[in-house]
Amino acid sequence: MSLSGVPLSAGLAPSPSNKPTNGKGQNIVRRSGNYKPALWDYDYLQSLPTLYAGEAHVEKLNKLKGEVRIMLEKTVTENPLAQLEQIDTLYRLGISYHFQDEIKALLNTIHNNNNNNNNNDDVYATALEFKLLRLYGYTVHSEVFNVFKDEIDKGFKAISLCGDYVKGMLSLYEASFYSFKGETILDEARDFSTKHLQKYVMMRHNNNSKDQSVDDDDDLVILVEYALELPMHWRMIRLEAKWFIDVYSKRRDDMNPTFLELAQIDFNLLQSTYQEDLKHVSRWWSTCKLGERLPFCRDRLVEVFLLAVALKYEAEFGYARRLLTKIGVLVTLMDDIYDVYGTLDELKLLEDAIERWNINELDQLPEYMNIFFVAMYNVVNGIAYDVLKENEILIVKYLKRAWMDACKSYMVEAKWYYSGYTPSLEEYLENGLISITIPLDLIFLYCLTTSPITEDSMEYLLQYPTILGLSGTLFRLVDDLATSSDELKRGDNPKSIQCYMHESGVCENDSREYIKNLISETWKQMNEVRVAKSPLFSQAFIESAVDFVRGAMLLYQKGDGFGTKHDGDAKDKLVSLFFNPIPTP
C-alpha cells in the first residue's frame, strides 16, 4: 500500500445528474443543517499580520523568563503562602508552563512540610494549597477542610462577608472542583461557598452598596462573578490567560510588573504562532476545495483550530496543531455527512470504503463522498508516513480502525434516526463517547506527539482506556447541553437530555439539571485519573485529554459555538484569542 499523497481528483466518480437519486429513479430528499457560513474567509486569514513574530520579541521573552526564575528562587521559604500565590498567579497568567521545574521544587517543599503547616485556621491558604497540589498531581486529602466545619451541626462555619473571608470562600469554591468521587466534604464546600459568594455579589450590586461589611476592592467581585460563571479548573488555559492579564494589569497593590510583562509578550508571541498555523491550514482547506464541493457541511476551520490549541498550545507543537486541525475538519465533514446529508445506503458505502482503505475502489461512492474519502486518505496516510519515518512503525491499520470505530458509531445513530428509536441514556452515552470522535482525535494526538510509539500502545489506545472515555463522555454531555434544541429542530436523534427524559419521565428542565450533575460527577472521575500515574501515557497526554474538555466548555458555554450560534459568544472569544493582541508599551 502506498503512503504517498493522492490528487483529490483521483477516483472521483462523475455525478449522474444534478439531482441525486436512490438508484430507482426517485429523487432523494436531503436534510439541511441550516449552518451559517464561516466567519473568517481565506483572504482574511491570509492577511493576518503576525505583528509579534521575530527574534527581538523572543529575546525579550527569554530575558523576562530569567528574571522570573530568579524571583522564584528568592521566594522566602518561611512564607509558603507567598509561594502559593506566586504559583497561582503564574498559572492564571498563562506562563507557568515556562517554570515547571521551579514550581515543582516549591510544591515539593510545601507538600513535604504539610504536617508542619500553619494554615489550619486559614481557609484561603488551605484551599489554595489544596487546589495547587491537586492541580500538579500531588496526593492531598480532603480531610484538611474538616477544621472549618462546626463541631455541633457538622456544617461549614459561617463568618461575616468581610473581604478576607470572601477571598477564602472563593479559594474554597475553586478548590472544590478538584474533588474525587466520594469526597462529600468538597461537595459541601462547593455548596457552602457558592451560596456565600452569590450573597456577596448580590450585596455588592444592591444599589451599588459598599457597606463596611463588604470589601471595597472591585477586583474581588470581578473574580467572584467570573468564577461563579465557570470555575477556573474547567476553563481553557489560553483564554483564561487573556482575561486574567487584563484584570491583573489593573491591580494597584500586589501586581508584579515583571510577571505582567512576561505574560503579555508570551500571549502575543503565541498568538502570532497561531496565526501562522491558521494561514497554513486555511491554504490546505482552500486547495482541497472541500468547502465548495460539500456546501451542506459546516465550514468551521477556526473553531476546529481552537480545539487543537486547547490540546497543545505551546509554540513548539505547531506541526501537531496543524494536522489535528485537518483531522478535526475532516471529522466535522464526516459528522455532517452522517447526521444531515447521507442516506443509509450511502453511509454503508462510505463505511465499506473506509474498511477497504483502497483509493482504487471508490466507484460505488457518490461524488461528494469521493472527495471526502480522498482528502481523508491523504491526511491520514501522510501522518502515518511521518510516524513511520520517526518511529519505524506502520500505524495505518490502527488509524483506520479508529476511524472505522467512529463510522460505526455514526451508523448506529443513523439507524436510530431512521427507525425512530430512542435509546436509554446509558446506551446513548456508550455509543456517544465514540461518535463525538474525541477518542479518535486523542489517538491522532498521541501519534503526533509521542515517541517511541509501539504496537502495544496502539492496541491499548484502541481499547479506549478510561482517560479517552471520560474525555469523550464529558465532551458529549457539554455539547448536548448547548446543541440539542437546535439539532432536534432539524430532525436529529434525541440527545442525552431527551434520552433521560424518555427513560425517567421527567421534564426538560429536570433532565438538564441531571445532565449538569452528571458532568460534575464525571469531572470527579477525570480528576482522579489526572493524579493517578499511568504506566503507558505521559502526564502531558493525560493533561491534553483534560484540556480537550476545557475547549468544549469554552465553545459550548453559551450555546452552540460550533454550529448554529457560532457568531455569538464563541466568536468574541476566538477573536480575543487569535486576532486581537494585547497592547504593550
Curated annotation (Swiss-Prot):
Tissue expr: Expressed in trichomes. Detected in flowers, but not in leaves.
Q: Does the keyword Transmembrane helix apply?
A: no
Region annotation (Disordered) maps to 1-29
SUPFAM superfamilies in alphabetical order: Terpenoid cyclases/Protein prenyltransferases, Terpenoid synthases
User: Which PANTHER family does this UniProt record tie to the protein?
Assistant: OS04G0344100 PROTEIN-RELATED (PTHR31225), TERPENE SYNTHASE 10 (PTHR31225:SF9)
Q: Where does (2E)-geranyl diphosphate bind?
A: R298, D335, D339, R476, D479
Name listed for the protein in its UniProt record: Probable monoterpene synthase MTS1, chloroplastic
**First-level EC class:** lyase
Annotated Pfam families: Terpene_synth, Terpene_synth_C
- The UniProt regions of compositional bias labelled Polar residues, in chain numbering, are 15-25
Residues binding Mg(2+) 2: D335, D339
* GO MF assignments: magnesium ion binding; terpene synthase activity
* Note describing how the cofactor binds: Binds 3 Mg(2+) or Mn(2+) ions per subunit.
